C-alpha cells in the first residue's frame, strides 16, 4: 500500500486532519516564495501536536545544508525534501547530519529521470511536474508514461497534480512507494480542505 504525504501544512488543525485521515507524513514548506510557507516556530508547534508515527518532512529549496539541519533539529523533522537545484554534495551533507533525504526531481522529459543516478545517498525521490521558474506547487501532473520504467521502485514518491480523483490511477500505473499532494487539497493557499484530504487518503489507500 502506498504511503501518503500531505504537504503544505500550516496549522495544527490541518495537521491533525491529515493525521486523522491516515496520512503517513505531513510536509512543512520553508521556501520563502511559497504561499504555503510556514515559520520555524509554527512548524515546531504543529510538529509537537502530531501523534507519534506521523513523519515530519521539511521542504527546502536551495537552502545550505547547515541551515536545513538546524531547522530539522528545532522542528523535529524526520526528512528533508530538497526541492531545488541541490547537488549530490548537499544531499550527502544533509544525510551525514542524521536526516533522511527526499530529493525532488522535476520531470520535464525522459532524461529528467536519469538524475536519480546522481544521488546515491538520497533515501527517496519525489517526482514532480516541471514548470519554468517553479519549485513545486504546480498543480499539474507530469507525464506518468515517462516514469513507467520505475514502476514498483521502492524509493519513488509521485507528486504533481494528484487529486482524490486521479491518485488511484497513478498508484495503479506506477506502483510507487508513496504519493504526495498539496495545492489540490486546499480551500485556499495554505488552508487544507478536510473533505479533500480525507478523500485523497482514502482513495490512495483503497
Swiss-Prot record:
Superkingdom to which the source organism belongs: Bacteria
Alphabetic keyword roster: Amino-acid biosynthesis, Aromatic amino acid biosynthesis, Isomerase, Tryptophan biosynthesis
Gene Ontology terms describing biological process: L-tryptophan biosynthetic process
Pfam families: PRAI
First-level EC class: isomerase
Similarity remark: Belongs to the TrpF family.
GO terms of molecular function: phosphoribosylanthranilate isomerase activity
Coiled coil: none
Pathway field: Amino-acid biosynthesis; L-tryptophan biosynthesis; L-tryptophan from chorismate: step 3/5
This enzyme's EC code(s): 5.3.1.24
Keyword Cell cycle: no
Catalytic activity: N-(5-phospho-beta-D-ribosyl)anthranilate = 1-(2-carboxyphenylamino)-1-deoxy-D-ribulose 5-phosphate
Protein name (record): N-(5'-phosphoribosyl)anthranilate isomerase
